[in-house]
């Protein structure tokens, strides 16, 4: 989950188990080590850093160079936790994989809400791998990527932080494919105990990390098609930029908020990612500046 904060890009390196920063001169700095793999990042109003710890399903808090537990999510989901968005009040929404073996055993799963004090509860159910998430500047709408469903889904956010009025915001995967072919292929892979390679089940774009801009567009990193795509509500595509490797996440930042940072790698399969160490961060200038959260 890359984030632009204090004039630096903050990002999680899963397999070096570290939260890192990158400044505009190209300098990389290690901030803190998270033994059980860091993922989504966000900040409380007082400036404390929240970090999703994937494997043990916790949110850790980094404050004054010390790491402590903010919230334990392990009783709410059996699956690895992943991306997170934190709003201006310090309320966090955290997604999870919805499967133990990627696309082989997909199950609808939940989105978890964590209040600023660390109290956690289920905010929404029956999501297909809730992943990258954004909140509009007024704090009233959430847009979340459902990776396995190939769509962006929106919710209204109430004053009590409850989610309602669920809608499909943009569809990337045809309904016929989502309902039939994808699950048939996943079943075959599971029965034959085959390793699912990225892109082998879904030839369409899917949302991994996402970010919001001032033109009410959402930039989507799509690992299956190795690109970043800008969508507007209804599924209209305004921009499409190919990446040399698989695109896993994106964030707008820079001095004017118009630099699009794109996190890429050749694979997210742990053994391959750890041995090859080929992750890269690309940048490009875009028309609209960053908006909302994160």
Residues covered by each model-derived region:
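Residue position within the beta-strands of beta-propeller blades
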Residues: 11-12, 51-52, 92-96, 143-145, ...
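Short, solvent-exposed loop/turn segments at conserved positions within beta-propeller repeat blades
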Residues: 14-15, 54-55, 98-109, 147-150, ...
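Flexible "stalk/tail and boundary" regions
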Residues: 23-24, 29, 45, 61-66, ...
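Beta-propeller fold detector
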Residues: 29-33, 68-72, 121-125, 163-173, ...
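Blade-level signature of beta-propeller repeat domains, shared across WD40, Kelch, NHL, RCC1
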Residues: 251-294
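Short loop/turn segments immediately following beta-strands, especially the blade-tip
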Residues: 155-162, 286-291
């Amino acid at each position: 989950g890359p984030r632009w904060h204090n004039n630096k890009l903050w990002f999680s390196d899963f397999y070096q188990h570290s939260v890192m920063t990158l400044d505009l001169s190209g300098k990389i700095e290690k901030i803190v080590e998270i033994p059980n793999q860091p993922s989504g990042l966000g900040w409380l109003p007082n400036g404390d850093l929240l970090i999703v710890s994937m494997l043990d399903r916790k949110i850790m808090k980094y404050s004054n160079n010390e790491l402590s537990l903010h919230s334990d999510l392990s009783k709410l989901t059996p699956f690895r936790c992943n991306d997170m968005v934190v709003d201006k009040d310090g309320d966090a929404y955290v997604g999870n994989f919805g499967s133990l073996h990627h696309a082989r055993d997909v199950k609808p799963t939940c989105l978890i809400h964590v209040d600023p004090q660390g109290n956690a509860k289920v905010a929404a159910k029956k999501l297909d791998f809730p992943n990258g998430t954004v909140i509009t500047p007024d704090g009233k709408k959430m847009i979340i990527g459902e990776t396995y469903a190939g769509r962006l889904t929106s919710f209204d956010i109430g004053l009590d932080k409850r989610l309602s009025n669920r809608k499909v915001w943009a569809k990337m995967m045809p309904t016929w494919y989502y309902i039939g072919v994808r699950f048939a292929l996943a079943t075959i892979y599971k029965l034959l105990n085959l390793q699912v390679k990225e892109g082998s089940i879904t030839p369409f774009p899917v949302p991994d990390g996402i970010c919001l801009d001032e033109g009410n567009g959402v930039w989507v990193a799509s690992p299956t098609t190795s690109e970043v795509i800008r969508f507007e509500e209804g599924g209209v595509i305004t921009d499409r930029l190919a990446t040399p490797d698989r695109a896993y996440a994106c964030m707008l930042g820079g001095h004017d908020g118009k630099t699009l940072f794109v996190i890429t790698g050749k694979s997210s399969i742990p053994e391959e990612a750890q041995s090859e160490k080929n992750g890269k961060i690309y940048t490009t200038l875009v028309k609209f500046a960053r908006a909302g959260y994160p």
